[in-house]
Design a protein with these regions (language model features):
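N-terminal flexible segment immediately upstream of the FAD-binding catalytic core
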Residues: 1-58, 75-111, 138, 262, ...
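Short amphipathic alpha-helices in soluble, non-transmembrane regions
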Residues: 7-11, 60, 287-293
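Short, structural beta-strand-to-alpha-helix junction motif
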Residues: 49, 74, 110, 116-122, ...
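FAD-binding subdomain of flavoenzyme oxidoreductases
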Residues: 120, 127-283
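C-terminal substrate-recognition/cap domain of FAD-linked oxidoreductases
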Residues: 257, 261-318
Length: 318
């Protein structure tokens, strides 16, 4: 078996001994999903800034490690932890939650979310300017990250805005020569070398003049049209929808995402929640079709609940 002590030493030099976990007890919160997914990892690394993340990736790629990128580890998709055993190489989990800066740009109409920034923090940051994130979803309350949502096209219950999607991101990939390569698709002038780009972004060392008025999408602009087509033979949402796969968007762990650029939305002046109950599922089908076909304004989100869920929520969730 290969001695990985030199690798661990190199990683500790980058992020500090405090943020390299190698014993089972400290690794468990990161190697076991809250919902599902569990397996062993050689180490868990917690970089604190973008350049540390880059240096950690370089070391891991050079040593041919399996890399699992992880943010909040909600366990909702099962992709942020090892899954069982039988891997052919050691696994390194890179947890990004310390890299949590959020930049408001374009008068708050867009944001830059770094690798570990959360929807909860984004909501707090946007509220004073009358804005809200794309994703107003349940997992916000358990620390779900902005980047994780984009990588998994999250937001299955979102009716009006659809899945999390952007064509503007900063990410690293392993190229055909087996080398780590940084790709800047944020459409922000941050420099040329990886180190320059990452340091400038981390420190928000750019001006409005550096932000390109991009024609690339920072949200899904076709979803309303798709979901209103109730006669379509194709579902409005399904896994691995090629329409939503664009580099960082839908990448699901195949690349390491450093930052994403996303649209924001005006907070509605008035919100209303409706609970509708029935003993006949056909009633819900008709309601759904009527709303999607005829309502001028679509609901922000919609969920189906079993009656037991409603009763439990009414009793325990206040």
């Amino acid at each position: 078996m290969k001695d990985n002590s030199k690798l661990i030493h190199e990683l500790r030099k980058v992020v500090g001994r405090k943020y390299v976990f190698t014993d089972s007890l400290n690794k468990e919160p990161f190697s076991k999903g809250w919902r599902y997914g569990e397996g062993n990892a050689l180490a868990v690394i917690k970089p604190g800034i973008l350049i540390e993340l880059w240096d950690v990736l370089k070391i891991c790629v050079k040593e041919d490690m399996i890399i699992i990128m992880q943010a909040a580890n909600t366990g909702l998709t099962g992709g942020s932890t090892p899954y069982g055993s039988g891997y052919d190489r050691p696994i390194i989990i890179i947890n990004t939650m310390r890299i949590d800066h959020i930049h408001l740009i374009n008068d708050g109409n867009q944001i830059i979310g770094l690798a570990g920034s959360t929807l909860y923090d984004l909501e707090k940051k946007l509220k004073p300017i009358g804005k809200e994130p794309h994703s107003v979803i349940g997992s916000t309350s358990i620390g779900a990250s902005i980047v994780g949502g984009v990588c998994n096209n999250s937001g299955g219950s979102l009716v009006k805005r659809g899945p999390a999607y952007t064509e503007l991101a900063l990410y690293a990939k392993v190229n055909k020569n087996g080398e780590l390569e940084l790709v800047n698709e944020l459409d922000i002038n941050l420099g040329k070398s990886p180190e320059e780009i990452l340091i400038n972004l981390q420190n928000k060392n750019y001006t409005n003049l550096d932000i390109i008025k991009s024609k690339k999408l920072a949200s899904d602009d076709k979803y309303v049209e798709i979901i209103r087509d109730v006669e379509s033979k194709t579902p409005s949402r399904f896994n691995a929808d090629k329409r939503l796969l664009y580099n960082a968007s839908g990448s699901a762990g195949k690349i390491a995402v450093f930052a994403v650029r996303m649209d924001t939305y005006d907070i509605p002046k008035k919100n209303q929640v409706f609970y509708v109950g029935t003993n006949d599922s056909k009633v819900f089908t008709q309601i759904r079709r009527d709303i999607l076909s005829n309502f001028k304004t679509l609901p922000t989100s919609g969920d189906y609940l079993h009656r037991d869920c409603y009763d439990a929520a009414k009793k325990y969730s206040k």
